[in-house]
């Protein structure tokens, strides 16, 4: 079974995590900070004990607060270990755009929602997710 890996930081990502925790697939949570002193939410504890959930971070213990730079570094870390990546929104000149272009240059499979903000990444070689999957994802939002 394929693991789902994400920072699960934004409100939408946290909603997705809540749904994924009800499933059976392995999950990897990568906060954009150190996990040295992390308080594990009760909802995660059983999944950690069962070996279904892993909390992973590339950051040293001094990196205690999430910021844009750490989030960008975390996103690159997640992309490095992921086989395929879903980007929902990558506007031109956003912080996500260069990551998407780099992933395509590295030969990673990059999935994108069918939205005008992603057209440049689609034209660069990104893959549209199916209409059915997109409808299911948008139903979660």
Report the location of each language-model feature.
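Glycine-biased, small-residue-rich flexible motifs in mid-sequence functional cores and linkers
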Residues: 1-141
């Amino acid at each position: 079974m394929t693991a789902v890996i994400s920072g699960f930081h934004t409100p939408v990502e946290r909603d997705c995590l809540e749904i994924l925790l009800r499933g059976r697939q392995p999950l990897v949570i990568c906060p954009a900070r150190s996990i040295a002193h992390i308080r594990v939410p009760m909802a995660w504890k059983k999944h950690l004990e069962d070996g279904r959930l892993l909390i992973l971070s590339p950051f040293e213990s001094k990196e205690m607060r999430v910021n844009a730079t750490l989030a960008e570094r975390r996103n690159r870390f997640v992309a490095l270990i992921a086989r395929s990546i879903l980007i929902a929104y990558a506007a031109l000149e956003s912080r996500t755009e260069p990551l998407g272009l780099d992933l395509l240059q590295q030969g990673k499979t990059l999935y994108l929602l069918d939205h005008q903000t992603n057209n440049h990444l689609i034209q660069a070689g990104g893959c549209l997710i199916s209409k059915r999957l997109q409808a299911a994802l948008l139903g979660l939002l």
